[in-house]
Amino acid sequence: MTLPPPIASTAANTILEKLSFCKSLNHIKQLHAHILRTVINHKLNSFLFNLSVSSSSINLSYALNVFSSIPSPPESIVFNPFLRDLSRSSEPRATILFYQRIRHVGGRLDQFSFLPILKAVSKVSALFEGMELHGVAFKIATLCDPFVETGFMDMYASCGRINYARNVFDEMSHRDVVTWNTMIERYCRFGLVDEAFKLFEEMKDSNVMPDEMILCNIVSACGRTGNMRYNRAIYEFLIENDVRMDTHLLTALVTMYAGAGCMDMAREFFRKMSVRNLFVSTAMVSGYSKCGRLDDAQVIFDQTEKKDLVCWTTMISAYVESDYPQEALRVFEEMCCSGIKPDVVSMFSVISACANLGILDKAKWVHSCIHVNGLESELSINNALINMYAKCGGLDATRDVFEKMPRRNVVSWSSMINALSMHGEASDALSLFARMKQENVEPNEVTFVGVLYGCSHSGLVEEGKKIFASMTDEYNITPKLEHYGCMVDLFGRANLLREALEVIESMPVASNVVIWGSLMSACRIHGELELGKFAAKRILELEPDHDGALVLMSNIYAREQRWEDVRNIRRVMEEKNVFKEKGLSRIDQNGKSHEFLIGDKRHKQSNEIYAKLDEVVSKLKLAGYVPDCGSVLVDVEEEEKKDLVLWHSEKLALCFGLMNEEKEEEKDSCGVIRIVKNLRVCEDCHLFFKLVSKVYEREIIVRDRTRFHCYKNGLCSCRDYW
C-alpha cells in the first residue's frame, strides 16, 4: 500500500488534498490529530465535517465519533451521507441514535434525511421513534414529498400498524405506481388479501396501470387463498388489457391457478413460458396431483430437467396421497439412482408409502436407505419407522427400533403401544404403558387411544374401563370421540351390546358414523339383528349413502330370507350409485406385488391358482371345514354361494403363496406368508386360514382393515375376536 505524503502544510487546500489520499483508519487518525493541532477554531467545524464524510467509507464508527464531536449544528448536506451509510449497515439502531444526536445539536432535516432514518426504523420496528419522526416531517412540511410519504407508509406497516399505513396512503395528494404497490404488497404480507384485492380494484378505477411487480404480489396473495372469484378477475384483467407477462408474473400465475386446482388455466400460462423454471414445474406437478390427474403430473415431472429434491418429493407424495404406494416407491428408487440424497421430508413420504403397502421386505429396504443417508438418529424418522414396521407385520423389527432409539418422546411411546395393540399383544401394550408412566412420560390423547384399542381387540373389558376412567381422574384429559369409540368397540366385541349403547347415549358430544358403525358391526357378529338395524338406521340418518349400513341391512334381511327387502335395498343402492367396496388382497412374491379381487381370473397363473384352491379345500374338508355362506347376500343356490365364498380375494392370494412356495422352494426368511387386505376378513376366510396354518404347517400373517391376524398351528392371534 502506498502511504500518503507526510502532512507538512497547514493550508486548507493541502489538508483537503490529504483527505482524498486516506485509505486506512490509521491515516484518518493521523490527519484527525493534525487538524485538531493546527486548525484555528472558526474553521475547525468545516474540517471536521469533511474528515467525517471522507472517513465514513473506511470506518463508519470512527466517522460517527468525529461527527458527534462537532459543536455547531451541522447542515443536512453534511449529515445526509452519514444517514445513508448507517442505514445500510448491520446496525440500524446507530442510524436512530445519530438522528437523535442531530436533533440534540439543533440540526435541520430535509426531505433527503427521512428515507434512511425510516429505513432503519422499519428494520427494528421502532414505532415510537417513527411516530416522532412523522411529527417532525409534518412540522417542516416535507410530507408533500411522495417519497417521504411512501417511506412513512412502509414504516408503519413494518411496525405492524397497517391501519396507520393506510391512513398515510389515503392522505397522499399524489400516488404513483410505487405507492400503490407498496400498500398492496404490505396488505399481502399481512395476509389481508381481501383488502389487497380491493385496493387493486381501486387502483384500476384510478386509471393507474399496475406493473408486473404489483401483479406478482396480488397474484401470489390470491393464490394462497384459493379464492376463485379473485382468480377469475385477475384472468379477465390480464386478457382485457393484453398485459405483457414476464417470467416472474407467469410463474406467479401458474402457481396461483395450480394451487387452486384450475389446471386448465395453469397449463395455459405454463405453455406461454419460454423458459420453465424448476419451481413452476413443481407447482404444476403438485396441482395435477391434488386434482387426481397423476398421469398429467407424471408427464410434467418426466419433462422437467435437473429435478431437485423438492420436485422428486412432490411426485412421491402425490402417489402416496392418491394411494399408489408402489408407484411412490418406484419414483423414490429413480430418485436414489439419479444421485439425489433424500431428507427427512422425502423419507416421511416413502415410509408412509411402505406402511400402506404392508410388505416387510420393502420396509427393511427403506430402513436401510435411512441408515445409508444418515437419518437414523432423527427422532421423527424413528417414530415413523415404528408405525411402518407395525403396519408391515414386523413386530420384532418394531420393538428393535423402539428399544434402540437414543431418545424417545410421547409419540414414540404411543406409536409402540399402538403397534402392540394392532397385533393383538394387549398385555405387552399395557406393560409398556406402565413402563411409560414409570419413566415419567405423560401420556396424551393418542396414547389412550392405543391402549384402549388394545383392550378392545383382546377383550380386556375391566382393564379398559379402568384406563378410560383414569383419563379424567388422573390426567385431566377429556375423552374425545375416538376414546368413546374404543369403549363402544370394547363392549361390543365382548357382547355387552346394551352397555355399548349406553356409552353412545351418555356421550357429552354427538356420536358419528364411526361409533354407530362399531355398534352395528358388533350386532352383526353377535346376531343381535334388531339392535343392528337400529344402529344402521342411525347411520343412514347421518349419512344416507353409507354403503356399510345398507349392506348390513341387506345382510340381515338375507339371513331372514327376506329376499324382496334385499332387492329393495339393492335397488336403492343402484339408484344412489352406492356400491360395496370390493375386497382386494395383495401378496408379495420375490419382490413383486400380486393383487387379487373376488373371483379374479386376470392373473397369468389363474388356472394353477384355482387348481390349488380345489386341492386346499379338499384337504381342509378332511379336517372338518364347511364353507360358511352367511356373508353371501344374494338369493342363489347353496352351491353357487359356496363358490362365491371360496373365491374371496384373500383365499386366492393364499393359494398363490402356497403354490409358489412349493414350486420355487423359496420362503419368507421366517417361513411366513404375508397378505394385506383392504377390508375386514370374513368369518369363513378366518376359519379357512386357521385350518391352512395347521394342515400345511404355515405361519400366515394377514393385515386387514382394522388389525393383524397371525395364524399359526390352527390358532389366530386375535383369539377369534376381530
From Swiss-Prot:
The keyword S-adenosyl-L-methionine does not apply. Residues 591-621 are annotated as: Type E(+) motif. GO terms for biological process: RNA modification. PPR repeats lie at residues 75-109, 110-140, 145-175, 176-210, 211-245, 246-276, 277-307, 308-342, 343-377, 378-408, 409-443, 444-479, 480-514. It comes from the Eukaryota. Gene3D superfamilies: Tetratricopeptide repeat domain. InterPro entries: DYW_dom, E_motif, Pentatricopeptide_rpt, PPR_At4g14850-like_plant, TPR-like_helical_dom_sf. Residues 622-722 are annotated as: Type DYW motif. Belongs to the PPR family. PCMP-H subfamily. PANTHER family: PENTATRICOPEPTIDE REPEAT-CONTAINING PROTEIN. This is Pentatricopeptide repeat-containing protein At4g14820. It comes from Arabidopsis thaliana. The lineage of its organism: Eukaryota, Viridiplantae, Streptophyta, Embryophyta, Tracheophyta. The gene is PCMP-H3.
